[in-house]
């Protein structure tokens, strides 16, 4: 990183509201003059990555998250396969992006989603409208209805690739990964039901797979304190806290880098 000629890639994991920590980390990187030449993101990482690649500052990204009332009654649906209609969030993004495509972004971005029918990971091409790619990537299964693009149904990119480090392999000289989905802190008393044990087992399974990808990064920013927050935080105070946690973890890990 001391060599300014090095191209830098940034990978942003999924994580719901905890993705606000991505913005905090980007704030620190920006202050250090570290600018990515490419970005890859899924789910919450796709939202933050898309906004940043478009030109929004980390503080503006935080304010964007705070402006959305996720559980507004207008967002609920009874006709689609989800508690909330993913299409209902289009207006929030349209005010910012309009009809721009991924290829028109200031920073090249790679956004992923899961093709529910084919069961394959989709990396959207440069001609895809940014709004469509982001909404498809962040359609959390069960909570948000699948998002349709050209008669194909897509759901959260994190289903198949929660931390898409592999997408930027060979596309940059130095890779920074920001991972905002640490394992939740629990105690034995929290594992008293079939549901809780099953959920914990899958959390550990996915975590093991994602942690292996840390080896593909030159620098990993993982705010473990985020384990104390839920995936769907609605408190603006907690959103501010998550932003600060991301910033502080980036700062601490930067000081400990062996470069």
Model-derived segments and their meaning:
Residues 1-42, 50-259:
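Patatin-like phospholipase
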């Amino acid at each position: 990183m001391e060599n300014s000629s090095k191209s830098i890639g940034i990978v942003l994991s999924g994580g719901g509201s905890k993705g606000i920590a991505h913005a905090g980390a980007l704030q620190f990187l920006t202050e250090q003059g570290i600018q990515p030449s490419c970005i890859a993101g899924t789910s919450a990482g796709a939202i933050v990555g898309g906004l940043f690649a478009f030109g929004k500052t980390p503080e503006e990204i935080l304010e964007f998250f705070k402006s959305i009332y996720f559980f507004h009654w207008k967002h609920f649906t009874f006709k689609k396969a989800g508690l909330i209609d993913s299409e209902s969030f289009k207006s929030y993004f349209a005010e910012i992006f309009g009809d721009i495509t991924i290829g028109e972004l200031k920073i090249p971005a790679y956004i992923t989603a899961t093709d529910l029918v084919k069961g394959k990971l989709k990396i959207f091409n440069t001609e895809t409208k940014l709004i469509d790619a982001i909404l498809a990537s962040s359609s959390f299964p069960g909570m948000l209805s699948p998002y349709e693009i050209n008669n194909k149904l897509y759901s959260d990119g994190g289903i198949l690739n929660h931390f898409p480090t592999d997408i930027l392999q060979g596309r940059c000289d130095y890779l920074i990964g920001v991972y905002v989905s640490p394992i939740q802190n629990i105690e034995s008393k929290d594992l008293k039901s079939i549901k809780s044990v099953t959920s914990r087992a899958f959390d550990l399974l996915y975590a093991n797979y994602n942690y292996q990808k840390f080896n593909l990064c030159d620098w990993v920013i993982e705010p473990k304190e985020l384990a104390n927050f839920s995936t769907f935080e609605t408190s603006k105070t907690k959103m501010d806290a998550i932003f600060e946690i991301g910033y502080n973890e980036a700062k601490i890990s930067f000081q400990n880098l062996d470069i």
